[in-house]
Amino acid sequence: MNTLDEIERAVKDTAHYVSGNLANYANRAAGENPSGEQQVGGDVWADDLFFDALAYIDGIGAYASEERSDVVDCGEGYSIAIDPLDGSSNLASNNSVGTIIGVYDAELPAAGREMVASLMVLYGPYTTLTIARSDRDVVQEHLLRDGHSERWGQFELPAEATVVGLAGKTGERSDAFNDIAQSFERDLKLRYGGATVADLAQVLEYGGLFGYPVTSGYPNGKLRVHFESAPLAYLVEAAGGASSDGSQSLLDVEPDGIHDRTPTFLGNAELVDELEAALSET
């Protein structure tokens, strides 16, 4: 079993436990994370669980989390970047949350091109793990239940786009973005729930576009390069889709810091191209 196999097994085991205990953290506040956002108790709890599961694997050199200010040195090997509980504010209303993990063959900060694997856990009506690895030709999906993992199949983005989920209030987004957003929303079904993993799962299943643009409140975008944008871009591009920060693939974004943010768009290539073209005219 190589290091990527051990990471995959550890994530499956930890996700089983997280899935069964989320209700215990539905209404627990916990302060602010290093990005200045409100934490819930589940954020810190999940981060501790995944740290214990991943940081001590032979071949892991560093662990970076959305919930920690600094990278933790673990020895030599791959660098882990994780959002342990994406969409955690959804817990209070009993809506879907997730876990996002990027595995980098480089010291952090690093561009997404340095990744060798991306893992996405969705805690919904049932729990799934979607994984892309450099040593596999397909994006695999696994069903996690009753302490076991069952391979369900593989993802290839549908050729026809049917859904769209674009974040941000109309009054906080640029006119150019609102124009292209309205065009997409006239033709596609709206799917936006406030947890990036859950919203992207809609795009992977049905085809379409997910995005978090520049807004007045988040002038650099809201999602973080290491913990959300690049790992999900790796997954989407491996499944035949495309990613963008508005002008280039998210895998080409070069972050200066661990918690750097970027505008984020993920989905069918023709929609991403159309979005980039519209934004380039401003």
Swiss-Prot record:
It is found in: Cytoplasm. Substrate binds at residues 86-89, 192, 222. GO terms for cellular component: cytoplasm. Keywords: Carbohydrate metabolism, Cytoplasm, Hydrolase, Magnesium, Metal-binding. It comes from the Archaea. It holds the Pfam family FBPase. It is an enzyme of class 3 (hydrolase). GO terms for biological process: fructose 1,6-bisphosphate metabolic process; fructose 6-phosphate metabolic process; fructose metabolic process; gluconeogenesis; sucrose biosynthetic process. Pathway: Carbohydrate biosynthesis; gluconeogenesis. Its EC number is 3.1.3.11. Mg(2+) 1 binds at residues 66, 83, 85. Homotetramer. Belongs to the FBPase class 1 family. This is Fructose-1,6-bisphosphatase class 1 2. It comes from Haloarcula marismortui (strain ATCC 43049 / DSM 3752 / JCM 8966 / VKM B-1809) (Halobacterium marismortui).
